[in-house]
């Protein structure tokens, strides 16, 4: 049974019907809604932190964004329309989705959205989540999420989710592959001020049709039946390919062990986290040691200030071949790797220069707010990389200052990475 075309047709039809129905009813019935329009103007050469972690948008000299959110009963709708995804100014959807709450603990979400786990992440200041950051345009997805509590202990609960998404055709894929996503977390609340969560998130590229250039081994139609999906779900082995010593897992897999400690007391917040990255059984068992993203964020320890410090390590990806020998975000069959529309889906520093571009990175994020004024700073420095260059250890930063003129929010920004420097402004109006 081939499920690729069948799923695509049904998903598109369902999302269009739900979107039209929701929009029409939201204008008729009472609801909570917010709308805003944003115009941006800046130089045509982009530095690192202006072109990365900005929702995959192609920052031209000028572009616009329209945002709208609406709550109607058990339904929530978010829409972003922008011309920054097209070279010819054609408006396209950014983060746009419909969420429907079946109950207090279960909801369906459909459209273009990022992730529904690792909610502790500060996407505005972070260098980027290890699996799904705001670096690329959100993929079209259909997901079901929920949570349930332990009856004997009200301080413990589980959260879970499963999603199905689709990539796009490109030079590597004549028929775009699917993305399978799932996660499960356990959360513990201690004395209502200490929170601990531990979870496992899993992503897998599967199905599709790869080209000769797009697949070093076994190009052509990739396994895509329901039986194959079940293998992808449990990371079971696919067929043995000629020349290989053993069968590999079906599809291209990646995931994280996700640890977070959160404390809230006297108006102050502290979050400590570690995302241990893995792509196979060996790295799942920590054979790649401390690879992944470490972070700490402190809020209001200095009044109206958020300080975030992160350490990114990918230097242990290939320390024990063939046992521990992962090219993070890359795959021998799905050669476009962990990308969507030519942008890395996860942390933009990971293998951005190509396979085995191992690195150690320090990242600082800072935010200060006073009344209607705000300053944001992001600063990153690679301390070690496999492919050393004069550019590798340079500081890359972006600073932004925003304020209000009547009802218009004005943001001025400047970025520099020692190769390029660029600046500009954003004007936002909420109505």
Positions of the model-derived regions?
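Bacterial Sec-dependent N-terminal signal peptides
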Residues: 1-32, 427-431
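Extracellular loop and loop/strand-boundary signature of outer-membrane beta-barrel proteins
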Residues: 51-54, 82-84, 126-132, 168-173, ...
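A conserved mid-domain beta-alpha-beta active-site/ligand-binding segment of alpha/beta enzyme cores
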Residues: 195-257
């Amino acid at each position: 049974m081939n499920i690729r075309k069948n799923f695509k047709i049904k998903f598109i039809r369902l999302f269009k019907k739900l979107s039209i129905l929701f929009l029409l009813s939201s204008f008729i019935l009472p609801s909570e809604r917010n709308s805003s329009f944003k115009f941006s103007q800046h130089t045509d050469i982009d530095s690192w932190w202006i072109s990365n972690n900005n929702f995959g948008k192609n920052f031209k000299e000028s572009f616009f964004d329209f945002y709208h959110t609406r709550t109607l009963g058990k339904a929530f709708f978010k829409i972003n329309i922008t011309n920054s995804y097209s070279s010819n100014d054609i408006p396209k959807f950014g983060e746009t989705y419909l969420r429907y709450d079946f109950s207090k603990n279960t909801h369906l979400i459909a459209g273009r959205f990022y992730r529904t786990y690792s909610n502790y992440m500060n996407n505005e200041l972070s260098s980027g989540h290890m699996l799904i950051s705001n670096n690329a345009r959100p993929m079209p997805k259909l997901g079901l999420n929920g949570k349930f509590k332990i009856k004997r202990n009200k301080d413990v609960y589980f959260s879970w989710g499963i999603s199905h998404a689709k990539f796009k055709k490109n030079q590597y894929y004549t028929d775009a592959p699917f993305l399978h996503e799932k996660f499960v977390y356990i959360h513990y609340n201690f004395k209502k001020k200490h929170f601990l969560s531990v979870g496992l998130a899993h992503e897998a590229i599967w199905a599709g049709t790869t080209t000769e250039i797009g697949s070093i081994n076994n190009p052509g139609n990739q396994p895509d039946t329901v039986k194959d999906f079940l293998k992808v779900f449990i990371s079971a082995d696919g067929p043995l390919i000629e020349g290989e010593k053993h069968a590999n897992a079906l599809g291209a897999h990646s995931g994280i062990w996700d640890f977070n400690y959160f404390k809230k007391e006297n108006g102050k917040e502290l979050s400590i986290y570690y995302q241990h990255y893995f792509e196979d059984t060996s790295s799942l068992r920590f054979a790649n040691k401390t690879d992944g993203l470490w972070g700490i964020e402190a809020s209001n320890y200095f009044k109206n200030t958020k300080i975030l410090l992160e350490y990114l390590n990918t230097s242990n990806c290939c320390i024990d071949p063939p046992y521990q020998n992962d090219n993070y975000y890359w795959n021998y069959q799905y050669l476009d790797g962990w990308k969507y529309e030519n942008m890395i889906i996860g942390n933009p520093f990971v293998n951005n220069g190509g396979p085995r571009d191992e690195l150690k990175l320090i990242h600082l994020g800072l935010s200060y707010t006073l009344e209607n004024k705000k300053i944001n700073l992001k600063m990153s420095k690679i301390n070690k990389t496999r492919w050393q260059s004069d550019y590798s250890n340079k500081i890359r930063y972006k600073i932004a200052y925003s304020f209000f003129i009547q009802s218009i929010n004005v943001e001025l920004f400047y970025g520099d990475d020692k190769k390029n420097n660029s600046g500009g402004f954003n004007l936002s109006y909420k109505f």
